[in-house]
Amino acid sequence: MIEKIWFENHPVKYLLWPLLWPLSLLFGAISRRQKAAYQRGAKASFQASIPVIVVGNITAGGNGKTPVVIWLVEKLQQLGFKPGVVSRGYGAKAPVYPMVVDSESLTSHCGDEPKLIFERTGALVAVDPIRPNAVKRLIELGANIIVTDDGLQHYALQRDIEVVVVDGQRRFGNQQLIPLGPLREPTSRLQNVDFIITNGGDAHQGEIAMSLMPDMAVNLMTGEKVTVNELASLVAFAGIGHPPRFFKTLEQLGADVVVSQGFADHQDFDPEAIAKLAHQGKNVIMTEKDAVKCRRFAQNNWWYLPVSAQFSSHDQQRILQRITEVVKEYGSSTA
């Protein structure tokens, strides 16, 4: 219901407005005070010895940050860098922090996005709610540039480049601060970032258009790849920030979806519940992010659909050129 108020102008907003409006004012006041404390030095912020790129957003929920992080990491690797990725591991609880993700890491310990980023890129990934501690660990392990998955509002970590990802369809909803609206910070915050990347929809002036291009479906058990429309009677589910985006992609690919089910972002799936859902069709299709949580109890008819961020060559060059400029300021070189 809350997202209907934020993004769909649901009539119930008139009932909840008197309750939520004061809370939004309080949220905004606290956020401004905390940010100002870091800016004037009343609160300490960590300056890393290597460049830091923050990929975040100003709204709650999933906007497509992780594909951007993966794209950045892969490009940096191609350029000879050794990137390290920082995440707070939302929804997870590690036995010790900072936690360095590896092939044996459980998503319940590190989080689904960190595990996905590690599996896709093989990069160094460290999880810690206190992000500067994760950065320090990655530097110890040899990283020479940092990419943070989320953390735009984590001002305890200084950054050199800020990238904001915007949902091109939903944009900023009713443009109110949490909890009345989806905003973590006012839209005026966008005036001070390096790049605004628009995921789908129409990019506004000054924004970079991004599309998420689906690949072939991959079998969770065997790694076999097929086109989605080769799979009959699909049960589709997604536990991401905005599940309808995934279902829309399947529709555009001509997938034979008989059942679709959305779950909360970062939800820890119950194997029995997923198995029961799977019995409603002949095959199961899920997002790659969900696959990292389902692999341990997957069946041989379960598939996931990987997607990759795509930009125009001009926009790619703009982003990479800015990174190169920052690296030169540090006097750094590729590994």
From Swiss-Prot:
BP GO annotations: lipid A biosynthetic process; lipopolysaccharide core region biosynthetic process
Q: In which pathway does it act?
A: Glycolipid biosynthesis; lipid IV(A) biosynthesis; lipid IV(A) from (3R)-3-hydroxytetradecanoyl-[acyl-carrier-protein] and UDP-N-acetyl-alpha-D-glucosamine: step 6/6
Q: What is its EC number?
A: 2.7.1.130
Q: Does the keyword DNA damage apply?
A: no
Q: Which reactions does this protein catalyse? A: a lipid A disaccharide + ATP = a lipid IVA + ADP + H(+)
Q: Pfam families under this entry?
A: LpxK
Annotated ATP binding lies at T59, A60, G61, G62, N63, G64, K65, T66
The top EC class, named as a word, is transferase
Q: Which GO terms describe its cellular component?
A: plasma membrane
Disulfide linkage: none
For this chain, one GO molecular function annotation is:
tetraacyldisaccharide 4'-kinase activity
Q: Which UniProt keywords apply?
A: ATP-binding, Kinase, Lipid A biosynthesis, Lipid biosynthesis, Lipid metabolism, Nucleotide-binding, Transferase
The family note in this entry says:
Belongs to the LpxK family.
Q: So what does this one do?
A: Transfers the gamma-phosphate of ATP to the 4'-position of a tetraacyldisaccharide 1-phosphate intermediate (termed DS-1-P) to form tetraacyldisaccharide 1,4'-bis-phosphate (lipid IVA).
Question: Cross-referenced NCBIfam families, in alphabetical order?
Answer: lpxK
Protein name per UniProt? Tetraacyldisaccharide 4'-kinase
Q: Which gene encodes it?
A: lpxK
